[in-house]
Swiss-Prot record:
This is 2-succinyl-5-enolpyruvyl-6-hydroxy-3-cyclohexene-1-carboxylate synthase. Homodimer. Its EC number is 2.2.1.9. Gene3D superfamilies: 3.40.50.970, TPP-binding domain (3.40.50.1220). It comes from Edwardsiella ictaluri (strain 93-146). It comes from the Bacteria.
Length: 559
């Protein structure tokens, strides 16, 4: 069998093995060395191929697909710096748990470290960030197909979160048509080809049914606080209902999808009455990590309950404050089922009153002003029916967290693992494609500029998509930090003075630039009636959002 045919056959077996582990989407960037993988993916009847010319955006497209589907998503790139461009998405997946399969084509070993073109040291180049790595040999019929598929099966069985990096060297020639002349190597897998299960069904360690904490019957009768970070929509809804049934205050992050029963917590947590009441908590039960609000993080770090339990399906330490307590690795819904609530009246009803007064203060303060603070506060009014929301990083996510209140169980996505602004537009595209739902996204101008190539992916949406770019002319998150005033604009804010009308035109997207709330709601409503993507630019005064937040913090503290 020629090298052409065997490269293709090797790649076909590899991809078939991945489909046995739930891989249905594959994201492909152009490249020559990756031709065997690309052609195998293109011809596979159960793989849906997505393409993008920018590998960094491609990785984030896969990240978005994995967020929504809950299934592993494969990525195919050529050798060299194309591989390095996957690093940001890989890091994010490692922190937030999405499973990515990075298939990186490589030069064969004899072309490494000898001056050959587009040949870099790719083995283990991602250091400790992948959950699993697999460095394949150069394809050869001397290695059995059973070895290849069982290697894939074993790596996938261990991949409960994060990325698997599979480095795939291919020697020339890379091009040519396959034929059925020599099938002995792959045919040795026999009836495996007609099935849908892995060759090697390697089980994870048996843990048995989830058992309740032995002292839960005691602690559920005490004064507790429920803290909900980044969890999925159903987990957030159930955790909030569980906490309210217990009579415990529920503090929900913007990504908790809990409905935030005590809204605007990041505004009222510094209030003297809130501090006095919450200091009486005997136990804090936290679901999910990655808290957003500064004041919430400060309270979480400073609180000293008798017990602190943190429940998250991801392993590892997820508490930067390093509380003494219990780190419980478990699915949230299963844990809730094993720990039923004992109904009780709220032990701190004053917090609900304080939260209501804070929300009323926000409404009265922002009612007459149009800007990013008002949009963050009223964002729930713009959400599509039976749709989903993606929130960017930096200032906007903090404003939505502090000023808004999103519906319980409404899907909210974000890249809050490493909290970078790279790849957000591409992630939005992946989230939309993965669900097929109408999608509202909101992000800042520098975030949009950073991933401007991602707008190309938004030309191919499957449901109405509205992307709101808050153009406050720079990284205004830094206006909230003690950055040196004389150097702030040049070295931190970096205003770009851009008009996103031209970006929308470049990628043939609908565009609007509303100047008040009525015009914004009209533009968003029109977006839901279109089948494509609408880019809405909000041109707002640079520091107005940060100043509004600071003003409201002062007002709520004085309530």
């Amino acid at each position: 069998m020629s090298s052409i045919l065997f490269n293709r056959r090797w790649a076909s077996v590899l991809l078939e093995a991945l489909t046995r582990h739930g891989v249905h989407h594959v994201c492909i960037a152009p490249g020559s060395r990756s031709t065997p993988l690309t052609m195998a993916a293109a011809s596979h009847p159960r793989l849906h191929s997505h393409t993008h010319f920018d590998e960094r955006g491609l990785g984030h497209l896969a990240l978005g697909l994995a967020k929504v589907s809950g299934q592993p998503v494969a990525v195919i790139v050529t050798s060299g710096t194309a591989v390095a461009n996957l690093y940001p998405a890989l890091i994010e997946a490692g922190l937030t748990g999405e499973r990515l399969i990075l298939l990186t084509a490589d030069r064969p070993p004899e072309l490494i470290d000898c001056g050959a073109n587009q040949a870099i040291r790719q083995q283990n180049m991602f250091a400790s960030h992948p959950t699993e790595t697999l460095s394949l040999p150069r394809p050869t019929p001397d290695i059995s197909a059973a070895w290849l598929v069982s290697s894939i099966d074993s790596a996938m069985a261990r991949l409960d979160h994060g990325a698997l990096h599979i480095n795939c060297p291919f020697a020339d020639p890379l091009y040519g048509e396959d034929d059925d002349g020599q099938q002995g190597w792959s045919a040795a897998l026999g009836c495996w080809w007609q099935g849908e299960t892995p060759w090697l069904q390697e089980s994870s360690p048996y843990t048995g049914a989830l058992r309740a904490e032995v002292d839960w019957a005691q602690w559920r009768r005490r004064r507790g606080v429920v803290l909900i970070g980044r969890v999925d929509a159903e987990a957030g809804r159930q955790a909030a209902a569980w906490g309210e049934e217990l009579g415990w205050p529920v503090l929900g992050d913007v990504l908790s999808q809990s409905g935030q029963p005590l809204p605007c917590a990041d505004l009222w947590l510094p209030h003297a009455e809130a501090r006095r009441l919450l200091a009486q908590a005997e136990i804090v039960v936290q679901f999910g990590a990655s808290l957003t609000g500064k004041r919430l993080l400060q309270w979480q770090a400073a609180c000293k309950p008798q017990r602190y339990w943190l429940i998250d399906p991801l392993p590892g330490r997820l508490d930067p404050a390093c509380h003494r307590g219990r780190r419980l690795v478990a699915p949230v819904q299963a844990w809730l089922q094993a720990h039923p609530a004992q109904p009780a009246a709220p032990w701190a009803p004053q917090l609900k009153v304080l939260a209501g007064r804070a929300a009323q203060c926000v409404e009265q303060t922002l009612q007459a002003s149009f800007g990013e603070a008002q949009v963050a506060h009223r964002l729930a009014q713009l959400l599509p029916l039976r749709g989903q929301l993606f929130v960017g990083n930096s200032l906007i996510v903090r404003l939505v967290d502090a000023l808004g209140q999103l519906p319980a169980g409404y899907p909210v996505y974000s890249n809050r693992g490493a909290s970078g602004i790279d790849g957000l537009v591409s992630t939005i595209a992946g989230v939309q494609r993965g669900s097929g739902l109408p999608t509202l996204a909101i992000l800042g101008d520098l975030s949009a500029l950073y991933d401007i190539n991602g707008l190309a992916l938004l030309r191919q949406v499957t449901a109405p998509t509205v992307v709101i770019v808050v153009n406050n002319n720079g990284g205004q998150i830094f206006s909230m930090l003690p950055t040196p005033p004389a150097e702030r604009e040049r070295f931190y804010l970096m205003p770009q003075n851009v008009d996103f009308r031209h970006a929308a035109a470049l990628f043939d997207l609908d565009y609007a630039c509303p100047v008040d709330w009525a015009a914004l709601t009209d533009a968003v409503s029109q977006g839901w009636r279109r089948c494509g993507t609408t880019l809405i630019e909000l041109r707002v005064p640079g520091t107005a959002g940060a100043e509004a937040l600071q003003q409201l913090l002062g007002k709520v503290a004085a309530l």
